[in-house]
């Protein structure tokens, strides 16, 4: 288990500490917005700014709002986080004048001179944070990705248990990690599904060539028989005594030339076929683009755009865009390689042609040369035609081979999915404990029960949007359509995994909620916060940070929270703005 404790947050310049905030090593840390007069506001005093600065110090990119602020830049402000990781003290620093760098200091005391710190690029700094906090626990889980769930953003973090505009696979993988459930199931199954999708695209491409295997087999037999007839005629001609010596040499060169010409034709044919495929894909994409105004057409005519038409149009457009990007590039690469081979073959052909002309001059009978040339030319034409037929047969046979591969992959999905489902079932005790924790928090807060469920998606589907192997999480509470209840649902949802990790001594024992206590009922906020503080103190691990305004708490709750030392920062506009987070207005 890796334990990280946020001990202090400093606001400094090159000469002094402007502000210092000390945090409870275990328990609830409340960042309180205050006002001295009724007409004053508690917004804008720096609660969210403090949370953002903690995020910056834990590897988040500093936003332009800070890096372009002249007041911060002129004051040469840098922020420092004093953390303890597995008993070792580390200072982490970021400077608004140097947002693309991070600073680390392994010492027991803080220095204002950044020259004494280890300055690294932001990418190296993020890797340092990653290594210190997670210690490489999961190769495909990063602290940068988890940070959005550990530090919920007040603007977008409390609309749902999942974050907006994020891929479902990644979201549930991260949440499953936080809930200590398997994280690899859907991702590993998707590897097989992606291979199947790629193979299906190849099948569609082959089917677009309109191959009739029966006709091709008949044509192949006909051409083989015709070529054998020509071979007999040529053989008989070549064995004539009068021309035996000279024609042998002539025939050898001619045969070699025919082979080269045959290869050239086959390559040119393949090259043309690839170009036709590229042209067909581009034409179809052009036609699809011509339908871009179809949504406006429907809206103008019937007042709305049918969902079924929209879905079909999106699927067609997505497919052909994929084909142009993926198969188009594939065909172009093949064309370049074939053209390089053609150049070599044409050079060889030129040499053989010159040898053939020289051999022909040796022969005395022009009629003989003309006769054998006609026969051999006809034979060459049939061999080229046969090569083309066999190429198309090969394409058809390839389709059957692809189907075999798809069947193998589908069987593998069935096997792996069954194995992962059994693995998920083995986590039933953890799931039960998580549900119990969730409902206990609901009971403490609302004297009600909610619904928290973890379901393994066991359905096998070939659909592109299939989520086979995903461990889905569902969460609901009574009356959650109100903003206050919705925000409290997400608070309790996060607190469930947070408390579970603290109780079971798992890594990542920090949770930060910014702005999520503004809307809930004042009568339940203090009750929940006091319960969380008691639970963390009982287990002697875990830090829960929240921002809240003074007027959003009941007076009795406020006094008790303060008496128990849970309020770690009081921010307001008084004392000439020195009580703001930075100690000044910016």
UniProtKB/Swiss-Prot annotation:
Q: List the disulfide bonds.
A: none
Query: Which UniProt keywords are listed?
Result: Coiled coil
Pfam families referenced in this protein's UniProt entry, alphabetically: DUF2326
Which residue ranges run through the membrane?
none
Q: Does the keyword Aminoacyl-tRNA synthetase apply?
A: no
Q: Which InterPro entries match?
A: DUF2326 (IPR018760), P-loop_NTPase (IPR027417)
On the tree of life, the source organism's domain of life is Bacteria
Q: Which residues form a coiled coil?
A: 183-293, 331-400
Protein name per UniProt:
Uncharacterized protein YydD
Organism (species):
Bacillus subtilis (strain 168)
Name the encoding gene, please.
yydD
């Amino acid at each position: 288990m890796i334990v990280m404790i946020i001990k202090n947050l400093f606001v400094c310049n090159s000469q002094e500490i402007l502000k210092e905030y000390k945090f409870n090593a275990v328990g609830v840390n409340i960042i309180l917005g205050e006002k001295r007069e009724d007409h004053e506001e508690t917004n804008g005093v720096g609660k969210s700014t403090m949370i953002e600065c903690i995020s910056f110090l834990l590897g988040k990119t500093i936003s332009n709002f800070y890096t372009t602020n002249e007041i911060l830049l002129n004051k040469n402000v840098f922020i420092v986080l004093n953390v303890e990781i597995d008993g070792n003290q580390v200072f982490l620093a970021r400077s608004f004048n140097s947002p693309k760098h991070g600073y680390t200091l392994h010492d027991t005391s803080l220095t204002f001179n950044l020259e004494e710190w280890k300055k690294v690029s932001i990418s190296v700094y993020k890797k340092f944070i990653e290594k210190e906090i997670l210690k490489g626990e999961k190769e495909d889980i990063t602290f940068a990705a988890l940070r959005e769930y550990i530090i919920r953003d007040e603007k977008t973090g409390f609309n749902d248990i999942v974050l907006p505009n994020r891929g479902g696979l990644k979201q549930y993988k991260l949440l499953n990690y936080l809930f200590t459930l398997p994280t690899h199931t859907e991702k590993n199954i998707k590897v097989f599904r992606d291979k199947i999708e790629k193979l299906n695209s190849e099948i569609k491409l082959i089917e677009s060539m309109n191959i009739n295997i029966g006709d091709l087999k008949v044509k192949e037999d006909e051409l083989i028989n015709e070529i054998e007839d020509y071979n007999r005629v040529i053989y008989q001609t070549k064995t004539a005594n009068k021309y035996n010596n000279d024609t042998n040499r002539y025939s050898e060169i001619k045969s070699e030339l025919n082979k080269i010409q045959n290869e050239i034709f086959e390559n040119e044919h393949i090259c043309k076929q690839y170009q036709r495929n590229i042209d067909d894909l581009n034409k179809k994409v052009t036609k699809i683009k011509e339908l871009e105004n179809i949504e406006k057409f429907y809206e103008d005519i019937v007042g709305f755009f049918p969902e079924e038409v929209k879905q079909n149009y999106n699927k067609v457009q997505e497919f052909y865009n994929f084909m142009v990007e993926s198969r188009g590039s594939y065909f172009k690469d093949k064309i370049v390689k074939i053209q390089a081979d053609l150049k070599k073959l044409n050079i060889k052909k030129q040499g053989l042609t010159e040898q053939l002309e020289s051999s022909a001059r040796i022969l005395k009978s022009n009629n003989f040369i003309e006769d054998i040339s006609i026969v051999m030319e006809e034979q060459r034409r049939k061999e080229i035609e046969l090569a083309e037929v066999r190429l198309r047969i090969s394409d058809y046979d390839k389709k059957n081979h692809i189907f075999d591969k798809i069947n193998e992959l589908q069987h593998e999905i069935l096997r792996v999915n069954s194995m992962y489902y059994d693995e998920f079932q083995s986590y039933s005790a953890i799931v039960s404990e998580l549900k119990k924790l969730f409902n206990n928090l609901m009971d403490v807060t609302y004297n009600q029960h909610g619904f928290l469920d973890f379901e393994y998606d066991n359905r096998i589907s070939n659909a592109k949007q299939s989520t086979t192997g995903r461990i889905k999480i569902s969460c609901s509470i009574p009356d959650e359509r109100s903003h206050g209840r919705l925000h409290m649902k997400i608070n309790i949802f996060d607190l469930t995994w947070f408390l579970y990790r603290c109780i079971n001594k798992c890594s990542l024992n920090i949770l930060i909620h910014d702005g999520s206590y503004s809307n809930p009922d004042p009568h339940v906020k203090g009750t929940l916060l006091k319960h969380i503080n008691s639970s963390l103190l009982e287990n002697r691990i875990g830090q829960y940070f929240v921002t809240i305004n003074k007027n959003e708490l009941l007076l009795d709750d406020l006094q008790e929270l303060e008496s128990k030392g849970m309020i770690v920062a009081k921010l307001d506009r008084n004392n000439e703005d020195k009580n703001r987070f930075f100690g000044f207005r910016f």
